[in-house]
């Protein structure tokens, strides 16, 4: 039942895929936590495509953020796709909790589990999209045996843990290499995305862009529109 409901809900929202063009996913890690629900509503009104939710455990990455209860609460604020980026050790322990809380896409790090293929299958069994994230120093070769089983690759263009970091240019070659591995794969880039860095990522093959500090430090609508314009 969870599978059917989540799958239908996801496709009603437009799903993911290159045919849907450029998508902007504001990261609420950079939002004002004292009014998180309002922030989610505001980025929805401003034209965001996804809500990017960074889940951190203080072990896999040096920060603590959101868990399923927070996701469940803000799920009531919008129908936007919830792109849940799980940065925790042994993510398989909490996949079902994130799905039940409202995740539409669950992204896990290749570095966070020794059974990556099993976790991908676990995610997809709940009827949501599965993604794999790579840290800046992780080569794209780790995707070789799972790339046909996933819906998205998230390329970290900063070291995970904190918002507001500078973009690492070396990841551009990684984006290009992933695109060659599978031309129809969605490639999301997370870290240091601004109106100055988005174009080079889009030209390399990325189509989904996480922007935290850039969006939340200005006029949300103007910044989201400018990102979409620059990515074309």
Where are these regions (language model features)?
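Internal catalytic-core helix/loop-beta-alpha segment
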Residues: 129-133, 137
């Amino acid at each position: 039942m969870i599978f059917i409901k989540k799958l239908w809900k996801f496709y009603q929202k437009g799903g993911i895929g290159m045919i849907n063009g450029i998508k902007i996913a504001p990261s609420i890690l950079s939002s004002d936590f004292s009014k998180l629900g309002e922030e989610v509503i505001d980025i929805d009104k401003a034209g965001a495509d996804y809500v990017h939710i960074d889940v951190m455990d203080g072990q896999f990455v040096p920060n603590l953020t959101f868990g399923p209860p927070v996701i469940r609460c803000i799920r009531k604020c919008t129908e936007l796709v919830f792109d849940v980026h799980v940065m925790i050790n042994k993510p398989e322990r909490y996949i079902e909790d994130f799905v039940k809380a409202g995740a539409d896409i669950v992204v896990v790090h290749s570095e966070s589990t020794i059974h990556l293929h099993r976790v991908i299958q676990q995610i997809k069994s709940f009827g949501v999209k599965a993604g794999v994230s790579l840290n800046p120093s992780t080569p794209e070769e780790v995707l070789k045996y799972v790339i046909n089983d996933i819906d998205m690759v998230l390329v970290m263009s900063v070291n995970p843990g904190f918002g507001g970091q500078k973009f690492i240019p070396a990841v551009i070659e990684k984006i290009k290499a992933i695109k060659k591995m599978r031309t129809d794969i969605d490639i999301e880039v997370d870290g240091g995305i601004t109106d100055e860095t988005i174009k080079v990522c889009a030209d390399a093959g990325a189509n989904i862009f996480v922007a935290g500090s850039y969006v939340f430090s200005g006029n949300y609508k103007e910044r989201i529109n400018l990102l979409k314009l620059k990515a074309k």
